[in-house]
Amino acid sequence: MLRRVFLSLALLAAAPLPALAQANAGQPAPAFTLTDLDGRKVALADLRGKFVVLEWTNPSCPFVQKHYGSGNMQSLQKRFTAEGVQWIVINSTAASHSEYLKPADQKAWLQKQGAAASVAALDADGSVGRTYGAKTTPHMYVIDPNGVLVYAGAIDDKRSANPADIKIANNYLLQAFGELRAGKPVSAPSTQAYGCTIKYGS
């Protein structure tokens, strides 16, 4: 009897733990409220009826620098916000990490880069990033006007930090929006994001 108990406990310990819930393309985008870099509340619910892009970032990451240093990210931000898309930049770096930036420093960096996002916010406790399953910087998400997540993954298909690769890359955001504007479903709703690991707190 005792042997069976120990065996059951061993099997239980070896069993994989249930994965944390993550946002999946084709499902409603998880609700969230963040505070932007100027101290104002930003709620996803308030953006219903509009396309929303979520961009996870970390200025210290070479992959983020690839897209900002080349002007690629700013170009995308300007293009989509001009079309009425709400673009939210989110930094989930933990406040205890050396790469954490205070709101004023994050704002100054974005201004220096000429960023054109609608909103920039910090997610220092990592709650929103974990809910969405954001793993890298950059990690991109597209939410449609009905609040459904229609794309989650990489910004493009060139998994390098080399800015020269941008010109030959297939940009998944441009592809997704091109299909959505044409009334078609997104052909690649999920891709594997690449970049630097998000520095979540413990």
Give the predicted meaning of each segment:
Residues 45-65, 177:
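Short active-site neighborhood of thiol/selenol oxidoreductases, capturing the structured segment around
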Residues 21-29:
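Cleaved targeting-peptide boundary
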Residues 142-202:
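Thiol-/selenol-based redox modules, centered on thioredoxin-like
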Residues 32-52:
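A short beta-strand-turn-helix
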Residues 65-113, 124-131:
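Structural microenvironment flanking redox-active thiols in thiol-disulfide oxidoreductases
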Residues 2-11:
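N-terminal export leaders
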Residues 107-150:
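Short, internal strand/loop/helix patches
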Residues 15-21:
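Sec/Tat signal peptide C-region and signal peptidase I cleavage site
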